[in-house]
Amino acid sequence: MTTNGFDPFEWRSFYFPGMSREEAHKLLGEPQVSIGTFLMRDSSRPGEYSLTVREADEGNAVCHYLIERGEPKEDGTAAAGVKIANQSFPDIPALLNHFKMRVLTEASLLAAYKKPIIEVVVGTFKFTGERETDLPFEQGERLEILSKTNQDWWEARNALGTTGLVPANYVQIQMEFHNDRTSKGASQSSIGSSGGGAERFSSASTSSDNIELQPRLPAKAKVTFDRVPNAYDPTQLRVKKGQTVLVTQKMSNGMYKAELDGQIGSVPHTYLRFTAVSE
């Protein structure tokens, strides 16, 4: 499992609605789960949350903390903020960030236990998003599907770890995952990770996906989609479909560093397909 931090503002990516205290305890109590790994779930008290944390290796210790709504205002209007024990915070990200740097009982919050992956999909169209809960993506961008809230909208996670809803008819399934989340840590992402994921998967596409068979770098790769990055970001490489680039490095954010006509920059791995040795 990775312990490279988390984004407090993306707390819904490690929030498990409907999960019981017992299931959360079992998940984080597994021997392979690292100290400081945590998740959020619904409390038995309606409208409030619980923070479940792996605190120690001895006895696979797991602790549960109630996240309460803040005290109602003096005028009787809705409660403001949240609190844990006797400490109050303006919102959940502030609470998580506080305990990222401070100890709860025996450990700080080090790594989020992320939702397991159901499927990996690729965007067939660009989606800009209309609501705060939507997850915008580009054509060709790769996403992890975490849950299918209904037939039309799925919960997804991108290479940066941002989660949100995506329209099902804007993506194409690339891989199906078969997870047993009670026996393995699901914080390992298949997107943006250079290590091997714990999940088992089977291809759901009849076409070959050479990007999964990464050769030793540096290596040549074909560009599969046109890409015009933000003009104000000089670290990104502009490429056109059909061009051949030299990939020199795979970065921790899931992008590749590549060279083209003397220019060096970053390209999302979903825009590249490694060429066979004979090509």
Swiss-Prot record:
<keyword id="KW-0727">SH2 domain</keyword>
<dbReference type="Pfam" id="PF07653">
    <property type="entry name" value="SH3_2"/>
</dbReference>
<dbReference type="GO" id="GO:1903356">
    <property type="term" value="P:positive regulation of distal tip cell migration"/>
</dbReference>
<dbReference type="GO" id="GO:0030971">
    <property type="term" value="F:receptor tyrosine kinase binding"/>
</dbReference>
<feature type="domain" description="SH3 2">
    <location>
        <begin position="214"/>
        <end position="277"/>
    </location>
</feature>
<comment type="subunit">
    <text>Interacts with ced-5 (via C-terminus which contains a candidate SH3-binding, proline-rich region). Forms a ternary complex with ced-5 and ced-12. Interacts (via SH2 domain) with src-1 (when activated and phosphorylated at 'Tyr-416').</text>
</comment>
<feature type="domain" description="SH2">
    <location>
        <begin position="14"/>
        <end position="115"/>
    </location>
</feature>
<keyword id="KW-0728">SH3 domain</keyword>
<dbReference type="GO" id="GO:0007167">
    <property type="term" value="P:enzyme-linked receptor protein signaling pathway"/>
</dbReference>
<dbReference type="GO" id="GO:0044877">
    <property type="term" value="F:protein-containing complex binding"/>
</dbReference>
<dbReference type="GO" id="GO:1901076">
    <property type="term" value="P:positive regulation of engulfment of apoptotic cell"/>
</dbReference>
<dbReference type="InterPro" id="IPR051184">
    <property type="entry name" value="Tyrosine-phos_adapter"/>
</dbReference>
<dbReference type="InterPro" id="IPR036860">
    <property type="entry name" value="SH2_dom_sf"/>
</dbReference>
<keyword id="KW-0677">Repeat</keyword>
<dbReference type="GO" id="GO:0030036">
    <property type="term" value="P:actin cytoskeleton organization"/>
</dbReference>
<comment type="similarity">
    <text>Belongs to the CRK family.</text>
</comment>
<comment type="function">
    <text>Required for cell migration and engulfment of cell corpses but not for programmed cell death/apoptosis. Has a role in the migration of the 2 gonadal distal tip cells (DTCs). Plays a role in protecting dopaminergic neurons from oxidative stress-induced degeneration.</text>
</comment>
<dbReference type="InterPro" id="IPR000980">
    <property type="entry name" value="SH2"/>
</dbReference>
<dbReference type="GO" id="GO:0005886">
    <property type="term" value="C:plasma membrane"/>
</dbReference>
<dbReference type="GO" id="GO:0006915">
    <property type="term" value="P:apoptotic process"/>
</dbReference>
<dbReference type="GO" id="GO:0012501">
    <property type="term" value="P:programmed cell death"/>
</dbReference>
<dbReference type="GO" id="GO:0035591">
    <property type="term" value="F:signaling adaptor activity"/>
</dbReference>
<dbReference type="GO" id="GO:1902742">
    <property type="term" value="P:apoptotic process involved in development"/>
</dbReference>
<feature type="domain" description="SH3 1">
    <location>
        <begin position="116"/>
        <end position="176"/>
    </location>
</feature>
<dbReference type="InterPro" id="IPR001452">
    <property type="entry name" value="SH3_domain"/>
</dbReference>
<dbReference type="Pfam" id="PF00018">
    <property type="entry name" value="SH3_1"/>
</dbReference>
<protein>
    <recommendedName>
        <fullName>Cell death abnormality protein 2</fullName>
    </recommendedName>
</protein>
<dbReference type="GO" id="GO:0005737">
    <property type="term" value="C:cytoplasm"/>
</dbReference>
<keyword id="KW-0581">Phagocytosis</keyword>
<dbReference type="GO" id="GO:0007165">
    <property type="term" value="P:signal transduction"/>
</dbReference>
<dbReference type="GO" id="GO:0016477">
    <property type="term" value="P:cell migration"/>
</dbReference>
<dbReference type="Pfam" id="PF00017">
    <property type="entry name" value="SH2"/>
</dbReference>
<feature type="compositionally biased region" description="Polar residues">
    <location>
        <begin position="202"/>
        <end position="211"/>
    </location>
</feature>
<feature type="region of interest" description="Disordered">
    <location>
        <begin position="181"/>
        <end position="213"/>
    </location>
</feature>
<dbReference type="InterPro" id="IPR036028">
    <property type="entry name" value="SH3-like_dom_sf"/>
</dbReference>
<dbReference type="GO" id="GO:0043652">
    <property type="term" value="P:engulfment of apoptotic cell"/>
</dbReference>
